[in-house]
Design a protein with these regions (language model features):
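A short, Lys/Arg-rich alpha-helix, primarily the initiator
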Residues: 1-16, 26, 89-93
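Residue-level detection of the helix-turn-helix DNA-binding "recognition helix"
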Residues: 14, 28, 39-41, 68
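Short alpha-helical DNA-recognition segment
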Residues: 17-36
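K/E-rich alpha-helical interaction surfaces of small helical-bundle regulatory domains
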Residues: 22-24, 58-67
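DNA major-groove recognition helix of helix-turn-helix/homeodomain DNA-binding modules
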Residues: 47-62
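Short, charged recognition helix plus adjacent turn
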Residues: 64-94
Length: 94
């Protein structure tokens, strides 16, 4: 489970287009802690998960349950990446 959460944290960071240091600055954790979590060397702490959820609240449901509900603003990194691709190609519907 912890490696799954670490992978999810990494997916969120990448979907937001952030490098590790920028992400760490936002969630107030040391870079080495993030590296250890993302690579599965350590489990994410409750504090880290809370900070990720606070800073990137649109991913909270997905982070904890593997589900997304766009109707209430809860998405997955996959949805965010698709949105970014649509914006870049000019095919978004907004």
């Amino acid at each position: 489970m912890s490696s799954d959460l670490g992978k999810k944290v990494r997916e969120i960071r990448e979907a937001e287009g952030l490098g590790r240091q920028a992400f760490c600055d936002l969630i107030n954790v040391p870079k080495q802690t993030l590296i250890n979590v993302e690579t599965g060397r350590s489990s994410p702490s409750g504090k880290l998960l809370a900070e990720v959820s606070k800073c990137f609240s649109k991913y909270t449901l997905w982070l904890m349950t593997d589900q997304a509900d766009e109707s209430c603003g809860q998405i997955s990194p996959e949805i965010e990446k698709a949105r970014q691709t649509l914006k870049q190609t000019g095919t978004d519907t907004d």
